[in-house]
A protein has these predicted regions:
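Inter-motif core of Ras-like GTPase G domains
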Residues: 38-40, 58-78
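C-terminal lobe/tail of nucleotide-utilizing enzymes
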Residues: 88-178
Length: 178
């Protein structure tokens, strides 16, 4: 199994990994198109991690890739909910199906008692999802174990009950597409 990925940093030679990639719209659109057409993906799910908002990258993805659905990933801060609203409205205007909303950094669980501590507030993502009749698929905690596995390149070893709803929604989307 495993995760396959491609990114702009793989396309540019002789650069330090901390150097920014500064591209304008037409170049971004071309790179997105190239990722889609020139890479032999052979995957059941293709995740496209995009910058927040409604700029060139989401526009290029929505226009050039036949999408079965998108998952809007957000965090609980008030300002972020405005960005999510824009992304959802953009997808709706472009007839891109939305599978649901996933809230990242929802809370941290106390290691001693398990109590959820909402560092960035609570309920904003759920409210935004409800306004658009979308399911809130998962609320991902800030989890040091998950962070350690990601850093070690072993994300597939992670198990978290909060992930099940999102996985179920993806499976339903795949079945509808077949």
């Amino acid at each position: 199994i495993g995760v396959r990925r491609v990114g702009s940093e793989m396309c540019i030679r002789d650069r330090d990994e901390t150097d920014p990639v500064i591209w304008r719209g037409p170049v971004i659109g071309g790179v997105v198109q190239q990722f889609w057409t020139d890479v032999a993906w052979d995957v059941d799910y293709l995740f496209v991690d995009m910058p927040p908002g409604t700029g060139d990258v989401p526009l290029s993805v929505f226009q050039s890739i036949a999408l079965d659905g998108i998952i809007v990933v957000t965090s609980p801060q008030e300002l972020v909910s405005m960005v999510v609203e824009k992304a959802v409205k953009m997808a709706e205007k472009m007839d891109v199906p939305i599978v649901g909303v996933v809230e990242n950094m929802s809370y941290v669980a106390c290691p001693d008692c398990g109590k959820k501590i909402y560092l960035f507030g609570q309920g904003k993502s759920e409210e935004a999802a409800k306004r658009h009749n979308l399911p809130l698929l998962a609320q991902m905690p800030i989890d040091p174990k998950l962070a350690a596995l990601v850093d070690a390149g072993k994300i597939e070893e992670f198990e978290g009950a909060w992930l099940n709803a999102a996985a179920d929604a993806l499976e339903k989307t795949q079945k509808r597409a077949e």
